[in-house]
């Protein structure tokens, strides 16, 4: 059977099991086997219109149940994310919720402004829940954008997202959000806007469609160094690709700002917004390009940090990725898989970030991004956050390197950075990355044991 058909069947099966879990949770509670086995109960919670949640909590609450962890992603279905059960089995109360955006992935209707209001519902729910004294946000992947933007605005007010440095200002409706007591960014990426930038195909000719590509800028052209078993691009190609990518990014922003001015003056196609389709602009993982094919890019940290091993030990060292090449197929010609289907306003507030002429990235650094030009940027957002911060990276995936960037920008006096050896972006063990079977052990357990220790450290959130 064709590999894509098999993958589609597996994804359908995973979604079926996820929703069966939620239905069981609503009906009476589920306690699957986890790294820790304290029994839990789960309760469906309607936080708002189109904003479902499931509260996971120990059946016999202990001291750690005073901490309520709130989990929400920028667009994905997180009602059964591993944090829901792994942390509740370790004694914490965990509210896992979905925002009100569509979960099909075809259109990107989940504007950051709206999902921030959805997140406010979750924080408010935990704030009034009996027995919860502290609320800690957990952002994974694109959830790092949502949770860091939320906490920055909640601590500092909307003035932090209405300054002249922002591409567009946030609305006043985001004022007055209740702040959390802590923030965990566990394999957050660089932000929705930066991931759109990193996924933008500079080979696309024109902006009317994705079927015509410039072969000299195509990462999937073998003449440029592409190899499905592992690509190696020349320094010249990398420079040309990144320069063209940054140029197209800024051109898209300028064009969208021009359309916004027309819309605001009453001359748009609609009075409130306009549809916008960007060919080769889909930001999801299968479209992340260049560094996903060439593992020498974004391959190690600049400084030494704790690396967590399967046996519970840690070593402070330069952190190298163990990932393998991914993304061997171009989706630029596909509307559903390769294009960003959004609106002018949503693009500018959620997916746009400015870059300078020297935009680039190499083995250990990203250069030339104005992290403060948008509130869709964890590195920019953490500059205003004062509560305790935990940031972690999974070395079996490229997004792990964002953890160092976020940590270096963080204002928090109490901030922690650690990396999990051999974990995928979803915290599971990267078996394809192992040189010997079992080399990395149970990385889910390694990850959540560390999170548990950070949350329950005396004096941080617990007396």
Which functions belong to the PLM regions below?
Residues 64-74:
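Short beta-strand element of the alpha/beta-hydrolase
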